């Protein structure tokens, strides 16, 4: 049986580019959420349902669709799911009311599976000692897509309107859908592919949650981290574009652009986790995150000072994700996609909670309530990271 070939360096980075483009779609809404709310005549709490339902649909899509990656070609599945994303974007672009816009966003979320197929695909095609580094490259692509989406959406919406943002996104998705067949390997069936039928794959998730309980802890940690990430950027957009601060959506985009420089440090944190072990590294990263996020409230009314906690959060947030993924991507190859399914479902459930909480807290308590809630979630993440280290140590070894 033909073995999957090792990824070249160029392929690793092209996969990261693909991950960036397909991930970005869900995050264009963040800097323009105020503009969209005003266009449709709704308040902050109601518009918060758009990203919340997107995140819930993403969790459902991952639960139902991602396990197929353990049985069928990742290449074929990725292309099919990107076509589905194109459909959701077109609905959002043409929507004349909030209901149809929300339907398109929800459809988009359901098919946003490619960023989570790609790490499992890559993990079977890299040497074990490079797993942390390559996982970090793909994670950097995801985070870069999220951050650049905010920059582009904020600036484009300020000068050309929010619909133009989604027309551009549709064009990018069509381009990446056409490019994927040349990036991903064709015609090799993985020797470790599961022989379980589809319903068996879904049912096996319960057995994995029972037998591989650490993935639940890693998923909870990332769910908290991702939820606070979403709450921060939604609350920040409402705060900066509201009457108290009075900035345009382009300023939110520029701030996201500044934060995007942090993505270049992510591969370094992955290599560090390769050396000292992912669980120990995660404890350290979570402590740094608490220190950074504690500055949100005192610096909240000064745009320049706000850059400090935002930069710190954007440096260590992806690093925590990388270390959490490393705790299960080192497991048996035939289990990795399903373990990823459990992890990502928990992550996006956290994102849905963060979407609702970020907008509702801002409407009820302003920036103070939002900043304090995010700090509390950071503290809980830090505690769970320490618990995970105490329970599991770093049993899968540093490799260097």
Regions found by a protein language model. Name each.
Residues 2-6, 185-219:
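Juxtamembrane intracellular "pre-TM" segments in multi-pass secondary transporters
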Residues 60-98:
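Conserved MFS/SLC helix-loop-helix module at the cytosolic interface between two early adjacent transmembrane helices
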Residues 62-73, 264-278, 362:
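Helix-to-loop junctions at the C-terminal end of transmembrane segments
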Residues 77-90, 280-295, 375:
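Structural signature of the two symmetry-related core transmembrane helices
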Residues 104-141:
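Cytoplasmic helix-loop-helix junction between adjacent transmembrane helices
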Residues 114-126, 319-332:
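Intracellular juxtamembrane helix-capping segments at the cytosolic ends
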Residues 137-182:
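Helix-loop-helix hairpin linking two adjacent transmembrane segments in secondary transporters
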Residues 279-324:
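C-terminal transmembrane helical hairpin of 12-TM major facilitator-type secondary transporters
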């Amino acid at each position: 049986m033909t073995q999957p070939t090792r990824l070249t360096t160029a392929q690793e980075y092209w996969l990261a580019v693909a991950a960036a483009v397909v991930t970005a779609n869900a995050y264009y809404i963040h800097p323009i959420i105020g503009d969209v709310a005003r266009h449709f005549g709704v308040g902050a709490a109601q518009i918060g349902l758009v990203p919340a339902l997107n995140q819930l649909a993403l969790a459902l899509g991952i639960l139902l669709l991602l396990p197929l990656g353990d049985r069928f070609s990742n290449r074929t599945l990725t292309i099919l799911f990107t076509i589905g994303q194109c459909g959701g974007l077109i609905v959002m672009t043409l929507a004349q009311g909030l209901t149809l816009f929300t339907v398109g966003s929800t459809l988009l979320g359901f098919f946003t599976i490619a960023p989570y197929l790609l790490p499992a695909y890559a993990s079977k095609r890299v040497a074990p000692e490079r797993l942390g580094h390559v996982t970090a490259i793909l994670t950097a692509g995801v985070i870069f897509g999220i951050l650049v989406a905010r920059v582009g959406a904020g600036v484009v919406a300020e000068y050309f309107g929010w619909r133009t943002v989604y027309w551009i996104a549709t064009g990018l998705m069509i381009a990446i859908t056409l490019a994927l067949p040349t990036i991903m390997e064709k015609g090799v069936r993985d020797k470790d592919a599961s022989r379980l039928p589809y319903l068996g794959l879904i049912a096996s998730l319960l057995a994995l949650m029972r037998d591989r309980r650490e993935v639940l802890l890693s998923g909870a940690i990332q769910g908290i981290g991702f939820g606070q990430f979403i709450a921060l950027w939604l609350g920040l957009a409402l705060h900066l574009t509201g009457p108290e601060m009075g900035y345009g959506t382009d300023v939110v985009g520029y701030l996201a652009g500044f934060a995007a420089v942090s993505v270049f440090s992510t591969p370094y944190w992955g290599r560090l986790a390769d050396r000292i072990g992912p669980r120990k590294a995660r404890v350290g990263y979570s402590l740094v995150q608490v220190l950074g996020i504690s500055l949100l409230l005192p610096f909240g009314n000064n745009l320049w000072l706000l850059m400090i906690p935002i930069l710190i959060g954007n440096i260590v947030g992806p690093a925590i994700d990388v270390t959490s993924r490393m705790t299960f991507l080192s497991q048996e190859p035939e289990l990795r996609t399903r373990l990823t399914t459990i992890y990502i479902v928990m992550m996006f459930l956290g994102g849905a909670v963060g979407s609702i909480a970020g907008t509702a807290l801002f409407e009820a308590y302003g920036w103070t309530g939002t900043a304090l809630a995010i700090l509390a979630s950071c503290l809980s993440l830090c505690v769970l990271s320490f618990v995970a280290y105490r329970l599991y140590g770093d049993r899968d070894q540093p490799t260097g």
